[in-house]
Amino acid sequence: MNEILNTKDINTIGEFFIETWGCQMNEEDSEKLSGMLKKEGYIRTEERENADVIIFNTCCVRENAELKVYGNLGILKGLKSKNPNLIIAVTGCMMQQKGMAETIKKKFPFVDIIIGTHNLHNFPNYLNEVKKKDTSVLKIQEKEDSIIENMPIDRKNSMKAFVTIMYGCNNFCTYCIVPYVRGRERSRTPENIEAEIKKLISEGYKEITLLGQNVNSYGKDLEPNVTFAELLKRVNNIEGLERVRFMTSHPKDLTDDVIEAIAKCDKLCEQIHLPVQSGSSEILKKMNRHYDREKYLDVVSKIKKLIPNVALSTDIIVGFPGETEKDFEETLSLVKEVEYDSAFTFLYSIRKGTPAAKFEDQVPEDVKHKRFNRLVEVVNEISAKKNKAYEGKIEEVLVEGTSKNDENKLMGRTRTGKLVNFIGDKDSIGEFVNVKIIKANSFSLTGEEI
């Protein structure tokens, strides 16, 4: 008869649960954590209560993300009391902030592992250390190491995958914490990127999204230099790959070469996420964005000229310090002029350690909220109009699975990133099909397979 081992025994195979907050980079980091743990013999669970290891992968771009982490850690105290052998780990950008790891350990002493963004690859070692020595680990690496290649990765999707092409950011926008928690820009070699994509294709993947904090800066740190436009062309030539997307682009670095590459490369989807943040040149200067309203609109004009059917999306911050009614009106007018297919709108959130946190002319909360509501109304109106233009058209859709709202329907996305729910054959999941769009909704399209 086999002996039942204590869950803290090093040889025990257990279950793990990961909760992720934040951007696509964080999502991919969680896929790597999952890959490493599965390699160790762990099984993933979607139920916190069943887990032997719980990992929170955190975000600190906005205060709301941090508050969610605090709230969820508070809930875990009860689980830890019921199961003292439960191992709780917190990682990600929030932990990389100066003094945050110590704050978490003080507030939540039951947390076993606290690490940042630069030593994620060592997580299995830290886990084994906790299990073996019945101790806790708090290790925040201040500086980024060289890029770790070939990490195990457990991807959530079997047909679409994220491929990180670079890490970090050198831009230092005055509102943003990212350069402080993700480090300076480091690019992967094109050979390593191509190798990862080829492996994914061999496993049946159809669509790749190239990730970076600012993909347009790709390759500046490589010897010899490789531009993002050159990388796009190389990726486009990979046999068997069907679709390529990328994010995020910084307007100051979106060159004519990149726009031309998107227009000419047949696998590159006609979708560009181009964060504007504000329509006011005055505010953009205070944000340290390195472009003004005119320059941004010039880039948009070039994009629309070369890629007429492009879907543009953006990020907008409402209530940045010093934003006047005139500044906000300029944001509204820019949104109307560009006509974004979608926009991610945010209330300005003070991030400790950033220059903007010290700006004295903070906008009152009630003013921020009123402006936010006005902006969302305009954005949604334009999105609905853009979606309406798809009615009657036939679109190529990569079928991702059954619809979340109706199990009798399938769902997938067009090349321009539009979500389509449609009646079709379930055997089509994982394949490309043509769908006739019969109805436009506020945030999605409805159609039927033809």
UniProtKB/Swiss-Prot annotation:
GO MF term set: 4 iron, 4 sulfur cluster binding; metal ion binding; N6-isopentenyladenosine methylthiotransferase activity
Top-rank taxon, per record: Bacteria
Catalysed reaction, written as an equation: N(6)-dimethylallyladenosine(37) in tRNA + (sulfur carrier)-SH + AH2 + 2 S-adenosyl-L-methionine = 2-methylsulfanyl-N(6)-dimethylallyladenosine(37) in tRNA + (sulfur carrier)-H + 5'-deoxyadenosine + L-methionine + A + S-adenosyl-L-homocysteine + 2 H(+)
Keyword annotations: 4Fe-4S, Cytoplasm, Iron, Iron-sulfur, Metal-binding, S-adenosyl-L-methionine, Transferase, tRNA processing
Ranges of residues in domain Radical SAM core: 155-385
UniProt cross-references to InterPro entries, sorted A to Z: Elp3/MiaA/NifB-like_rSAM, Methylthiotransferase, Methylthiotransferase_CS, Methylthiotransferase_N, Methylthiotransferase_N_sf, MiaB_methiolase, rSAM, rSAM_horseshoe
Entry binding sites for [4Fe-4S] cluster 1: C23, C59, C93
Co-factor(s): [4Fe-4S] cluster
Residues bound to [4Fe-4S] cluster 2: C169, C173, C176
Domain MTTase N-terminal: 14-132
Residue ranges of every copy of the TRAM domain listed in the record: 388-450
Subcellular location: Cytoplasm
Gene3D superfamilies: Methylthiotransferase, N-terminal domain, tm_1862 like domain
KW DNA-binding (keyword) present: no
Subunit comment: Monomer.
Physiological role: Catalyzes the methylthiolation of N6-(dimethylallyl)adenosine (i(6)A), leading to the formation of 2-methylthio-N6-(dimethylallyl)adenosine (ms(2)i(6)A) at position 37 in tRNAs that read codons beginning with uridine.
Family the entry assigns: Belongs to the methylthiotransferase family. MiaB subfamily.
Protein name, as recorded: tRNA-2-methylthio-N(6)-dimethylallyladenosine synthase
